[in-house]
């Protein structure tokens, strides 16, 4: 089966995007892994699928698959690429759309300056709903690792995140601790591990070890979770400039019970055709 695809990225977090609005695409975990393979496939951090809406209240359905073949709830950088894709492909003439995800409805908007703003929804802070095994709802909680005990803040942006503050992201043990935190038993659905360096109250540097993908150049939901964690701990004031290895995002959050708004770029790299294995 031959399908058309578009390669896109948001701050170096790269995606293969497939239009399934007219013809369904059968994406097994093996097929996703084959497409995402950087040596034998197209190569990407995540595969994004555009599907018809499931109700009249939304414009599209948005599905996200990690490079390991697993389907996940949310991807912030992907959401920006999603709205750029459907607009550029003529699938909608709306500059702001409502999109159904496994985590709920999001509302990305294409701005006149070419950047994309996404209402990422209200962050979930209740441990049971993240999910995070804890009998406390404290903002900062200890997490025991094999060689360290780290202080983390658990946040869900539709997908789970564990954010810790580090002195310097360049020297932080992202690979070692990230892999251990991702599969920590206190996170039964696994977790994205964020390493945040606070430069000042309006600026952070961030690295994220993503669940099912490893460290990426940028993580949109990770940036949102880091800013929520930093504001909750009294370290940051909205809006916050988030510096990643792939570029910068702006994250705004007014506090508990309000949505997080993420703004950043979305870039088309190339288009092609592939044969599904």
From Swiss-Prot:
Substrate binds at residues 13, 46, 66, 76-77, 159, 192, 210-211, 220-221. It catalyses: (2S,6S)-2,6-diaminopimelate = meso-2,6-diaminopimelate. Pfam families: DAP_epimerase. It is an enzyme of class 5 (isomerase). Pathway: Amino-acid biosynthesis; L-lysine biosynthesis via DAP pathway; DL-2,6-diaminopimelate from LL-2,6-diaminopimelate: step 1/1. PROSITE patterns: DAP_EPIMERASE. GO terms for cellular component: cytosol. GO terms for biological process: lysine biosynthetic process via diaminopimelate. Its main location: cytoplasm. It is found in: Cytoplasm. The active site is at residues 75, 219. Transmembrane segments: none annotated. Its EC number is 5.1.1.7. Keywords: Amino-acid biosynthesis, Cytoplasm, Isomerase, Lysine biosynthesis. The record marks 161, 210 as: Could be important to modulate the pK values of the two catalytic cysteine residues. One of its GO terms (molecular function) is diaminopimelate epimerase activity. Belongs to the diaminopimelate epimerase family. Homodimer. Catalyzes the stereoinversion of LL-2,6-diaminopimelate (L,L-DAP) to meso-diaminopimelate (meso-DAP), a precursor of L-lysine and an essential component of the bacterial peptidoglycan. HAMAP family: DAP_epimerase (MF_00197). This is Diaminopimelate epimerase. It comes from Azoarcus sp. (strain BH72).
